[in-house]
């Protein structure tokens, strides 16, 4: 055939690869195995349960039983040199052993050798043998003539054997046997063999020596074993169809074929050559091929075998199949067997790797079982098999990997953590108790000033901010890490959101530059804004929690492990990018709070709460910045104890400090210093109660002082403010009093003129003080005379104020302006019952601040309280900026008659100029009166023009829903206004002791000079109205003394209210006006001068107004100092005419109720007015009338303003 036959045969084998794959068959029932094979199989089946139990990791300290059996067999049955060669692979030791036949490793532990086919290095040889066998089956079964001419086809068989070695390098030898008689012939007829010798292949024809195959030995087992059980390897598709079906299958080229399962594997063996073992372990693979009988029955024809060199095949003792499978010495419960690749056919090529949580005590580099070196003898290792057992010891608790038994996890300080959690629980309990205490003292002024709901909200948010420390006390888990973010963000948004919104409310109310009243921010509105903030935070937390749950489904955990510098491990909640975003959001929110703190830094407030909130916001900003920096930078290296202490320190440096700043000042505030209470109004309580109107002036003042606006802008703003306040008051009065007629537009001019004159008070006072040097002598005598007249009044009233204090309180005895909306604050009370506590406090404060003479007759405790909170001890804090810069405006505005309100700022702005000049002003007033005598005749005509408008103004300014007890007050006001027009001197008698809160230290001509212009003599019926009012008021005082005291505690709108003391049935005149008893001589002197001599009206008024204060009707209003001449004249005439004056006074007192009892209001009086009040017919000088422009109209306006809030009190008096 030649050389070309070998490649051709090899190609045929490759083409037949697919046919061999198709010929899969079921294995037929086998014949009984020979005794040797049965013994080997029995041993293998007996060892399988042992291996199964050894591989069970649940058995405690379980170890491979096959490893122990293998060691024992190698020590007992295997020759020493062979066992050493098997462990080391050293061929020098193998050459020293003598042999007579080959040595097989039969009966060794491990599963069936047939399963060794799974080894990757044997797949090539196995496939080549299977393809060659199937090729012979096809050739012999398809052509019967091939069996008859063996010698002719001998070259084809040689080419087939040679192709096996050339096709697979791992095959070292291949052979084929052929026999025409299946069982009758004891030996095969043809025996061909090919051997690989280094780089060449040797072909041999051993047919002549094939007779030795007839003997069944270990060396011929590959042939006899297949010959005996050839039927078990047969498989023919369609054999159940009979001969016809079988022939049909052959026509379709579907015949008998073999597969890999039909290949017979021999145990590994060593060949014996020349009395010694040849180095290299071999294994024999053999397969039979078949022909067909004439009846198409398969018949055995021969065997093909290949010998494979195993020196490059690794032994896997860790696997579950193959040679020496499961013979490792690793303990399966604490270690893992890992084979070592590339070492060849040697034992011990594996490592025992300790499992997680275990370590090897004698191995410091890595935890494994090292294979013994080539210089070590097997016997030495066999002797200490028990000592070589690989044992892994457990690590410390929680350690996944370790090299020794030292702890790898951070050991927590239990006592430290217990102390922290105990203190945290105490703080949370105190926080909860603080909520109860705040609710318990919810009616306290300090709590109402801040708002109960807002304080409770801050405390609840602080309780949430205390929870992170409690969460970090426990072992981290996914739920705890999620809950940690929830309580932190919700608590932060609740606490500092509320604080920031409170600051925002202060900024909105106090720093508004508009004159229009903005809608105040109540506690409910702040809570609604806070709800929006919490809703945003809640929505973010829901989204973040959803993303965390989705990451858990992707096996992305929220729990991680950190490692300290000492390589100790601890569990922690991982820091995500969302944590950086939340920290940035907190920082930006606090920056907004810092801006608000800066904006409201100058705003006055009750208990300085914005100042403490600003400290809390700045503290949170700084501490949180440090906390987040440490947390983000050192989070992976801070163990659980340090992280717990970090959160603990951050919580108490921010939350606890915030609570302390908000609560401690409220409960530790002392009420002994009322100066701060008066100077800094409790604005937040007013805002929450919806009564912010009285503090609008303060907000505008603060805004102007903050931004330093131009004076023109201030004037424009104030004009808008007063105009809108007037419109609102008019609308409210018309709404509540539909019976009142609307005012005419022609009356608006007078109101605007009066307002502009009011604003000129500071300049008037400053001009009066400029004449101090000129009138020095007169000032000293006037001051002494005024002090002499005031002492009896102070003695009768029980007042102990020094003379300096009374002089200082003259100018500033005006009552603080009442807001249009403060009538709501009046609380009703039944007849005869004491008023409410809040009403008493308000009355006490008003009377003490005003310093009226009526306050001198009050009980001692109320008087002391009044002195404590008097405005004499209050710093100059302007409650509004109503007229600070309007005084410089010289341009007269359009006239307008409207009921305006006076504010305390009118006097507060002038106090800086006049506080030290109170005594000096008196001398200037005396000089001005002398000059006013010349101007009166010329201005009487001017005063008559405004008489009608003043009448209408007085009627409209009366309280709308007055009861029966207030009906006398309307004609009283109307009559008094007409008296002012009838006689200029009547202006001094138009102020009651209640009205002295505004002008007890000022002369009418000095403060309100336009009132002098408006005064003109009126008809007689006007006097009857005054007398009627006096008699009714006196009867009311007689029937209800409580009502009389109540009337004294508030400013009366007109001076005629005290004329009721002239009634014989009323209280004695000395009790109401004690100074009258000591000043009768002065009164008699004036009366005598009127009746005996015809004194000009202007000069008489100048003298009387300088000599004494008005008695009965005008008590306490004129405390001006007279000139020296008038004073000396008074002293001389007091001694001579005292008796006659007392008689005339009593007669005049009896005539007053007679005129009151008149049925017609326009009936002429029974006595002339000169007999009752002779000093009113004295005419002041013209210069005095010109200079005194400010006060009577303003006092009338103040009376009109104050009359509104007293409807309820007058209604009660009517019931009495």
Curated annotation (Swiss-Prot):
- Its principal location? membrane
Glycan attachment sites: 98, 143, 215, 274, 333
- Where is the stretch described as Disordered? 25-65, 757-875, 911-1000, 1038-1072, 1128-1167
Q: Which residues carry this modification: Phosphoserine?
A: 694, 705, 708, 866, 947, 1066, 1081
**CDD domains reported in the protein's UniProt record:** 7tmC_GPR158-like
Cellular component GO terms, alphabetically? cell projection; nucleus; plasma membrane; postsynaptic membrane; presynaptic membrane
Q: Where is this motif: VCPWE motif 2?
A: 1072-1076
This one is known as Metabotropic glycine receptor
